[in-house]
Design a protein with these regions (language model features):
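Bacterial N-terminal signal peptides
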Residues: 10-18
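A compositional/structural signature for long, glycine/proline-rich flexible linkers
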Residues: 30-260
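Bacterial N-terminal signal peptides that target proteins for export
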Residues: 2-10
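Bacterial signal peptide processing site
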Residues: 22-25
Length: 260
């Protein structure tokens, strides 16, 4: 069978159609590659954005955790100190239950670790009290010119009042420590000190020369210091014994426990 020769025009048309088909196919392939590249780029961009958001969340969470730790550190320190210093049934010379006065009869020695840096020339006379339900009345005797101070710390470790020789003199004084939101009448001659928190630490210190004679004189002053609820003021009062919690670590320094 004899093939017919295509005319020049037919050949040209056929070539044009072939080129057009090839061009369209190439164009389709390019479009597909471009779309795939775009999709991949968008996917990678979303992944980078998600990773950045996750990193930002982690950084924010870490920053909040650090700020929370710093913010709460005083509260935790005070609470841990209170637990250790009051975890006894009765005053034992270096610790006392809530509402009882701890009357240290000698200078703190090197083994004393309830506070970080105790004074070495004063006798501590301290108590932890709860004024969330009713005021507590603090009575101080005439110190007869002796240097003494009774800082009152709230639950944040902030000192909100400091009766003592420099601020209020050394004559006999009586104070009502009241909690947040309390209002009411106080006995005549009683000065009100408002605490920002229900927990208060009275960290009293009385100067002592360290001689046997001066120890005896300061002991007599310590014995005249008292704290009682407002409802018991002017009446016989014995504070309730403490409850001992065996789970509390009484050996490790408070600072080390808080920082652990």
């Amino acid at each position: 069978m004899q093939r017919k020769k295509l005319s020049g025009v037919a050949v040209a048309v056929l070539c044009a159609l072939t080129l057009a088909a090839c061009g369209k196919q190439a164009e389709t392939q390019v479009d597909r590659v471009a779309m795939e590249a775009k999709a991949k780029a968008e996917s990678e961009a979303r992944a980078v954005e998600a990773a950045a958001k996750e990193a930002a969340k982690e950084a924010e969470a870490r920053a909040i955790a650090i700020e929370s730790y710093i913010y709460a550190y005083p509260l935790v320190t005070m609470e841990m100190t209170r637990r250790v210093m009051t975890n006894v049934a009765a005053p034992d010379g270096s610790r006392a239950p809530m509402g009882h006065f701890l009357r240290m009869r000698s200078y703190p020695d090197a083994a004393y670790r309830d506070v970080t840096a105790p004074n070495a020339d004063t006798l501590y006379t301290t108590t932890w009290i709860d004024v969330s339900k009713e005021p507590m009345i603090l009575s101080l005797p005439d110190m007869k010119g002796r240097y003494a101070l009774f800082p009152m710390l709230d639950g944040w470790t902030n000192v909100f009042q400091v009766p003592g020789k420099r601020t209020t003199g050394t004559k006999a004084q009586t104070y009502a420590i009241t909690g947040p939101g309390w209002s009411g009448e106080l006995p005549p001659g009683v000065t009100e000190y408002k605490s920002p928190t229900g927990l208060v630490w009275i960290l009293g210190r009385i100067y002592c020369t360290g001689t046997p004679e001066d120890y005896k004189a300061v002991h007599a002053l310590q014995d005249k210091i008292s704290v009682v609820p407002l409802s018991a003021y002017g009446k016989p009062y014995t504070p309730a014994p403490g409850a001992v919690d065996p789970a509390i670590d009484m050996k490790t320094a408070v600072r080390e426990q808080v920082n652990a």
